[in-house]
């Protein structure tokens, strides 16, 4: 997933044929780290998946704020990295297991020298040790809803963004929406992706007409009308979702 064009942004974040409501009532708004700004980098998928991991930990009472620049720099070692640096949430999960991760304050820009160690609560970790403490191997499940593939088994997503050839557990879109809503209401972190963009789902809201929306934490800074948040209707979730990542616990697996 990469930088989304404004025209597509306008069509996605409004209901088809209707003016976007000006007022939303929040039903759930989960804890999150400060809104970041990806700038011109097409790495929304890194920001979105890290934001989901951060929200997951904040729900446990942990304070975790992770550096997207570390992954953006380390993935340059990947032989199959696309020139445009696009990817998916599942890609990020693979990369942090391989290269590790550091806190945001340890690497606040792409120009910062890559740290060899991560520090938390006065303790020193290798970057891989730190990554395993914030995202255990196989902790997350990658989901999709493709009605042209068999349900309840892993399938391929054939997109250039899926350059690590990750496989996704395929469920009906109604099931995916219900599982996502339940995860958010239980304060889990969730990463959402369509073909052009990725964001973290941090809450649920409804408009004055009673229509429900997922509250998204975007990665375009805080200058927008909602301070860096976006509102995606359930209708657009059904229409546009390519993939969702959440913990297996959030999905309901042991």
Predicted regions and their residues:
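Bacterial N-terminal signal peptides
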Residues: 2-11
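C-terminal motif of bacterial Sec signal peptides marking the signal peptidase cleavage site
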Residues: 13-15
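Bacterial signal peptide processing site
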Residues: 17-19
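An N-terminal structural lobe/cap that precedes and organizes the functional/catalytic core
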Residues: 28-38, 63-66
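Active-site signature of cysteine proteases
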Residues: 33, 121-254
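Active-site nucleophilic cysteine motif
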Residues: 38-53, 82-94, 197
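Papain-like cysteine protease catalytic cores
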Residues: 64-134
């Amino acid at each position: 997933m990469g930088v989304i064009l404004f025209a597509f942004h306008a069509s996605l974040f409004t209901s088809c044929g209707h003016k976007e409501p000006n007022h939303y009532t929040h039903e759930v708004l989960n804890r999150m780290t400060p809104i970041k700004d990806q700038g011109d980098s097409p790495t929304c998928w890194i920001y979105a998946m890290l934001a989901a991991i951060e929200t997951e930990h904040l729900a446990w009472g942990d304070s975790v704020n992770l550096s997207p620049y570390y992954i953006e720099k380390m993935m340059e070692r990947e032989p199959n990295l696309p020139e445009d640096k696009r990817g998916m949430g599942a890609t990020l999960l693979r990369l942090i297991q391989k290269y590790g991760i550091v806190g945001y304050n340890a690497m606040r820009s792409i120009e910062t020298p890559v740290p060899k160690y991560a520090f938390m609560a006065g303790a020193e970790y290798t970057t891989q040790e730190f990554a395993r403490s914030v995202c255990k191997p196989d902790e997350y499940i990658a989901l999709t809803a493709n009605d042209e593939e068999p349900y309840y088994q892993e399938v391929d997503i054939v997109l250039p963004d899926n350059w690590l050839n990750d496989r996704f557990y395929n469920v009906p879109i109604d099931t995916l929406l219900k599982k996502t809503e339940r995860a958010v209401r239980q304060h889990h972190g969730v990463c959402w992706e369509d073909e052009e963009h990725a964001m973290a789902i941090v809450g649920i809201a409804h408009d004055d007409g009673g229509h429900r929306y997922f509250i998204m934490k975007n990665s375009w800074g805080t200058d927008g009308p909602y301070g860096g948040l976006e509102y995606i209707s359930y209708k657009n979730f059904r229409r546009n979702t390519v993939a969702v990542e959440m913990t297996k616990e959030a999905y309901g697996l042991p």
